[in-house]
Amino acid sequence: MALAASFNMTNPQPAIEGGISEVEIISQQVDEETKSIAPVQLVNFAYRDLPLAAVDLSTAGSQLLSNLDEDYQREGSNWLKPCCGKRAAVWQVFLLSASLNSFLVACVILVVILLTLELLIDIKLLQFSSAFQFAGVIHWISLVILSVFFSETVLRIVVLGIWDYIENKIEVFDGAVIILSLAPMVASTVANGPRSPWDAISLIIMLRIWRVKRVIDAYVLPVKLEMEMVIQQYEKAKVIQDEQLERLTQICQEQGFEIRQLRAHLAQQDLDLAAEREAALQAPHVLSQPRSRFKVVEAGTWEEETAAESVVEELQPSQEAMVKDDMNSYISQYYNGPSSDSGVPDAAVCMVTTAAIDIHQPDISSDLFSLDMPLKLGGNGTGATSESASRSSVTRAQSDSSQTLGSSTDCSTAREEPSSEPGPSPLPLPPQQQVEEATVQDLLSSLSEDPCPSQRALDPAPLSRPSPAGSAQTSPELEHRVSLFNQKNQEGFTVFQIRPVIHFQPTVPVLEDKFRSLESKEQKLHRVPEA
């Protein structure tokens, strides 16, 4: 009951509908947030950081739109800003694509070869029949290629903006190489025509071969950029997971604190969880047992007396069990005795050894050697009840119901199931014990009509025995002995004022002879020793 009360304590955390714990809800939120993570946008994506691969124009353009708003905030004239608005992102991807850079590298190699042939023809190191006509064609082809390079540089400045172009040093160097290659060729062509040795200055264009690096990077940087984006996504997911971990850690700390409080409460109640779990498992077996204050324990045979005997022990919790406040003590106190909350002091441990008397079959003999029934109760309502009886030998197994004789006022009975095997046969008894047995057996057979004389004694109604058939008037001596017997019984019960245990009608002549034989044993059977 204390365990149930401890678990009925107010829970600081509200219950979640549907039986779903807060931990499960947090995990679901983490999964949803992880799924809803959008591709990470590139922040401060400069021109020099763009890849040179042939990527999807729409995706790349969306990545570059965030930089345009910052570019629009630059101070200066409008011509210094990138043109075409948001469409500039498409041109940026085109100018930085791997295909365009591969084409430019091929054009550089071609113009270098053409200019070298033209120079060899002009210095007459290469002679053939139509060499001058061929040199003129080479000159114009080289001029067109250099013009294409210059147009590409102007397009870069217009699309990227003058500031981004100037900030990128490698692009400034590339533009300078193009201008230095195109300007001498144009000047020599205007001054001397296509046949001029000054066209060799245009060979400086071969410095633009560095574009090969851009082609190589076009196949490496996309993979690198993709991995960086994946890393950024994992970093963002890691931040979310760290936040959820902090929340779960806080929940675990709160639950740990609550567990410590519950354990402290259980420690104050002196409860043992392991014992309570075992008691809960054994509860069905305990509940199936009969509710009785007494249990019958079959004792072994004595060396002196080789007779089977049944010992009735009162179920009292031991001192250690009473100190230990667990579920087993609760169950045993509930079914086997009064609880400590009732205010009634527990009686002392009582051991009763007696012979079982079958009230339904009075003809069956049951041997009883001697009987001492002391009972002393103090003035404060507590006392030690001690009952001692001699061991009895049972000639056969108990019947379906058997009653034990004792001084307990609750008049409890112990039952044993009939056994199919016959009990051990008793040994011959001494003559004195046989006489005592016969005397007590006659007395008990006369009392067999009332299964619980002590309870009848506590009844306020007057007790009377029906007179047996054919009985005659009894003598005054027998009535005097019976009154002495009842008076001694009343002296034994100093606390409870009870009526005589045995009340005989004046017409009982049969018991006169029985009490005469019992006179010598009256002191032993019915005397209450001072305890």
Swiss-Prot record:
This is Transmembrane protein 266. Residues 380-477 are annotated as: Disordered. The transmembrane segment S4 functions as a voltage-sensor and is characterized by a series of positively charged amino acids at every third position. Transplantation of the transmembrane segment S4 into HVCN1, generates a functional voltage-activated proton channel. The gene is TMEM266. The keyword Disulfide bond applies. Residues 124-129, 191-199 are extracellular. It comes from the Eukaryota. One of its GO terms (molecular function) is protein homodimerization activity.
